[in-house]
Regions:
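Outer-membrane beta-barrel translocator domains and adjoining extracellular loop/strand segments
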Residues: 55-60, 106-112, 160-164, 202-209, ...
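Outer-membrane beta-barrel "beta-signal"
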Residues: 72, 212-233, 438-456
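Residues on the lipid-exposed face of transmembrane beta-strands in outer-membrane beta-barrel proteins
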Residues: 45, 70-76, 131-139, 151-155, ...
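Transmembrane beta-strands of outer-membrane beta-barrel proteins
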Residues: 41-45, 91-95, 147-151, 174, ...
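Surface-exposed strand-loop-strand hairpins of Gram-negative outer-membrane beta-barrel proteins
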Residues: 51-71, 108-121, 256-288
């Protein structure tokens, strides 16, 4: 019995030792592969000094407060061995790590207590650590200097959160900048940038004003093995064949109702608290059917119809019944609106939309917009849709039954990544916004149903 147990333990130790040796050997090989970079790899360190740019007037006191930061980057310089690298004037790409020191001892934070009454507190704004990826492109690329732009995207983590600006510990971090880069010698660059950066949680958790900063950035870029030799551009450039696709997408997201929607005032001015059953998060879904046109190696656009649905509409109808029971002015008098019952169809929306894409090989930055033509809340009523660009105020019916994120128009900002040998599928993530406010984040899967190329 003792020998059997001893043999069993020895066997386990043998396999554990074998596993450890194999793991160490693979780790050493991986490190050798990682650190054996070529002349396309570079390292960069940047220092930042900026000022806050608050959107809300009540946060104007923050404009004079400074923010300091440090960036570390590792990048890859393209050399034109692929056509898209030449099309984008030999851009570079890589990963960044960022630290931001926020010198704000106290920030104003307004919310509501359990009875629906507004309250004001002051809290400290914590520091921020961010990591993600970036693209560094050139508006002008010369022999000794270039005028560049950077697009950065990733995640940020805040040491303090739960206030009006940063509602959660994990957030999205975005930045865009422009400025000159000077090639000092074969191994060093000096760069200067003017940058706008934004950090928020894409409305996953409210409140979510976010932090906006305009800053100056000065950095040094180090090329350990010099610069790569660039493959010359072909003149004339290779002929491009335009193409068209019919596509369909499925986009899902969750949103949290804005804080001001969680209470309302009755006709006599009394603040009424929310419904007893709290439903803070709502599912949102958009199905798109449209046409994708690739009219240039770097640019394309979509024209489509958005068929949307949100569970937040049900909440609006429940709130309407509470308002009716409390004798709200919308339900009294000659201009009284009807008291309606909720159904699945009343949560539907229809909107035509367009989107413009900048295509970096398989990766695309996207910017688009849409306008609502129809809402399900009108189904079975004699109420008419308002066509102005105002979000509310012209229709008591819309103010009562239509969720605030679905009033008139909306925009999309995000990215796609094309999959497959023929790039017939894609995944993406977008911020659905209106009036410079993020409604919620969408996660998208799409497929091209039909494709054809223009005749030569």
């Amino acid at each position: 019995m003792r020998n059997a147990l001893l043999n069993k333990c020895v066997g386990r130790l043998f396999f554990a030792a074998l596993f450890l040796v194999l793991s160490l050997s693979k780790t050493v090989k991986a490190q050798e592969s990682f650190f054996s970079f070529d002349n396309r790899t570079y390292f960069e360190i940047d220092g930042r000094y900026g000022k806050y740019f608050p959107f809300e007037e009540r946060h104007a006191y923050m404009k004079v407060l400074p923010q300091y930061g440090v960036d570390l980057r590792i990048g890859r310089q393209t050399d034109g061995r692929m056509q898209w690298e030449k099309d984008f004037n030999y851009l570079s790409y890589g990963a960044f790590l960022r630290f931001e020191k926020n010198n704000v001892d106290s920030i104003q934070f307004k919310d509501r207590d359990e009875n629906g009454y507004e309250r004001e507190t002051w809290r400290a704004l914590g520091d921020c650590y961010s990591l993600g990826g970036y693209i560094n492109g050139h508006f002008y690329h010369g022999k000794y200097w270039s005028f560049d732009y950077d697009i950065m995207g990733g995640f940020s983590f805040w040491t303090k959160h739960g206030d009006e600006f940063i509602g959660s510990v994990a957030n999205v971090h975005l930045a865009i900048d422009a400025g000159p880069t000077f090639m000092i010698e074969d191994n060093f660059d000096l760069l200067v940038r003017y940058q706008f950066s934004h950090s928020s949680n894409a409305a996953f958790r409210l409140p979510n004003c976010g932090i906006n900063v305009f800053s100056w950035l000065v950095g040094v870029r180090y090329h350990p093995k010099g610069r790569p030799e660039l493959v010359p551009k072909e003149k004339p450039r290779p002929e491009f064949q335009k193409s068209t696709s019919i596509f369909a997408t499925e986009s899902v997201g969750v949103l949290q109702t804005n804080e001001w929607m969680r209470s309302y005032q009755t006709a006599d001015g009394t603040m009424v608290s929310d419904l007893p059953v709290e439903r803070p998060y709502y599912f949102a879904n958009v199905i798109q059917l449209g046409v994708h046109r690739q009219f240039h190696p770097k640019f394309s656009y979509d024209v489509c119809l958005d068929f949307g649905w949100t569970g937040e509409t049900k909440r609006m109808y429940e709130k309407a019944h509470q308002m009716y029971d409390d004798g709200h002015e919308y339900f009294t008098g000659d201009d009284a609106i009807p008291l309606m019952e909720y159904s699945f169809a009343r949560g539907l929306h229809l909107a035509p939309s367009v989107m413009f894409e900048i295509n970096y090989n398989r990766f695309a930055f996207c910017l688009g917009g849409a306008y609502y033509l129809w809402h399900g809340i009108y189904y079975g009523t004699d109420q008419k849709k308002t066509w102005s660009l105002k979000e509310s105020g012209e229709s008591n019916f819309e103010d009562t039954y239509l969720p605030p994120c679905y009033r008139t128009f909306y925009g999309r900002l995000g990215f796609k990544y094309y999959l497959g040998e023929n790039r017939n599928m894609f995944v993406g993530s977008f911020m659905k916004v209106h009036s410079a406010v993020i409604d919620y984040a969408e996660f998208t899967f799409g497929i091209n149903l039909f494709n054809w190329k223009d005749k030569k």
